[in-house]
Regions:
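C-terminal nucleotide
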Residues: 1-118, 129-168
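Glycine-rich active-site/cofactor-binding loop and its immediate structural neighborhood
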Residues: 125
């Protein structure tokens, strides 16, 4: 999705292929059980953008093209490192984007075998997307039994919620 300066939006479809399926099977979506107001988190950095913070955002935006290249070339394991890089840049935007619970969870995921991940949306809580191969997941969940894993699949038609019955 490209957001143009004139307010228009251009959507470029990514063909469903085996690379996308490989990516899907290596992603975990974890609910952090931390509720927050996205508007409050986003306003903590959007309204106070310095030159250096604008550079972080510009770098994050370039990751979209890098992600597309990864999907085209099939080097799917590089996606974890890309998520990690995006997360490190995003955390530099505001101290409200992460907290000790999120940092502990993320570090536990890395120590368990994840190659990267990032908090989705504005930050501060919500959902953590991790790139973790199946062989590392047992170790991850053994030490984190209270984590809520949200199963998901990519869809050609956009976001859909079939049924949601998780509780924090």
């Amino acid at each position: 999705i490209k957001f143009n300066k004139n307010g228009s939006i251009k959507v470029k479809k990514i063909k469903q292929n085996n690379n996308l399926k490989k990516l899907e099977k290596n992603l975990l979506l974890i609910y952090t059980s931390i509720n927050r107001t996205a508007h409050e988190i986003a306003s903590s950095y959007v309204n106070k953008l310095t030159k250096s913070k604008k550079k972080y955002i510009e770098s994050i935006i370039t990751h979209v093209n890098e992600g597309e290249k990864i999907l085209k070339t099939g080097n799917i394991d590089d996606f974890g490192e890309l998520l990690h890089s995006s997360w490190m840049l995003k955390k530099k935007l505001s101290s409200a984007i992460s907290n000790s619970k999120i940092d502990d969870l993320y570090n536990h995921a890395l120590l368990s075998g994840a190659s990267g991940g990032k908090l989705l949306g504005a930050g501060g809580g919500g959902f953590l997307l991790l790139y973790m191969k199946k062989k590392y997941r047992k170790k991850f969940f053994l030490k984190s039994k209270k984590l809520i894993n949200i199963p998901f699949k990519f869809s050609n038609i956009g976001s859909e919620v079939i049924y949601n019955n998780f509780q924090s």
